[in-house]
Curated annotation (Swiss-Prot):
Transmembrane segments: none annotated. The gene is rsmI. Belongs to the methyltransferase superfamily. RsmI family. It catalyses: cytidine(1402) in 16S rRNA + S-adenosyl-L-methionine = 2'-O-methylcytidine(1402) in 16S rRNA + S-adenosyl-L-homocysteine + H(+). Keywords: Cytoplasm, Methyltransferase, rRNA processing, S-adenosyl-L-methionine, Transferase. It is an enzyme of class 2 (transferase). This is Ribosomal RNA small subunit methyltransferase I. It comes from Thermotoga maritima (strain ATCC 43589 / DSM 3109 / JCM 10099 / NBRC 100826 / MSB8). One of its GO terms (cellular component) is cytoplasm. Coiled coil: none annotated. Pfam families: TP_methylase. Catalyzes the 2'-O-methylation of the ribose of cytidine 1402 (C1402) in 16S rRNA. One of its GO terms (molecular function) is rRNA (cytosine-2'-O-)-methyltransferase activity.
């Protein structure tokens, strides 16, 4: 039997890659990547030449049927996401699940995570929090926010720049004007941190159009 290795990669700054992650990517037989073009940038920087295969939400079922036989033949396969840890709001969980069912070894090479990085820098308590991934759209988002109104733990979620303002307006209306921390483009050239009331965040991003990858940390009910 081979081995599936879940490898964490940088969330922005490519220098945040770990020594063990580089060693692993150099040793495996195949690398599964959410977007092969983005992963190639990382591999080229560190002069790693390995076969790359796309693995995303659209093709995961097909890919699993191709990859399981390779693992059973003894191949070592790494899976990476575009940024951060695979499976965390990214493709991969179904492959990991199938490996466990088939008795194939699964290993982990931990790396950066936008989730934990945002909580750490937010100044909010990090001992208890909930993660909602990417919030749903429209009525489903409002329904979810209503269910979170009485949540006393810190709430963390990812959001797209196009939807950030509408999400913040829904939060203000449904949950209230709580303290919020917004991390944009973490570890990248145009990194931005904002902390203040939800109403202040709305004013800020109405004046300055949000761009890039965004993580939102919302304080819990007091």
């Amino acid at each position: 039997m081979g081995k599936l290795i879940i490898v964490g990669t940088p969330i922005g700054n490519l220098e945040d890659i770990t020594i063990r992650a580089l060693k692993t990517l150099r040793e495996v037989d195949l690398i599964l990547a959410e977007d092969t073009r983005r992963t190639m940038v990382l591999l080229n920087k560190y002069r790693i030449k390995k076969p790359l295969l796309s693995f995303n939400e659209r093709n995961s079922k097909k890919r699993i049927k191709e990859i399981l036989p390779l693992l059973k033949e003894g191949k070592k396969v790494a899976i990476v996401s575009d940024a951060g840890m695979p499976v965390i709001s990214d493709p991969g969980y179904n492959l990991v699940e199938e490996c466990w069912r088939e008795g194939i070894e699964v290993d982990i090479v931990p790396g950066p995570s936008a989730l934990t990085s945002a909580v750490a820098v937010s100044g909010f308590p990090g001992s208890k929090f909930i993660f909602e991934g990417f919030l749903p759209r429209g009525k489903n988002r409002r329904r979810l926010l209503k269910s979170l109104k009485k949540e006393n733990r810190v709430i963390v979620f990812f959001e797209s720049p196009e939807r950030l303002l509408s999400t913040l307006r829904d939060i203000l209306e449904i949950i209230g004007d709580r303290e919020v921390f917004i991390a944009r483009e973490m570890t990248k050239l145009h990194q931005e941190f904002f902390r203040g009331k939800v109403s202040e965040a709305i004013s800020h991003f109405e004046k300055k159009k949000p761009l890039g990858e965004i993580t939102v940390v919302l304080s819990g009910k007091e």
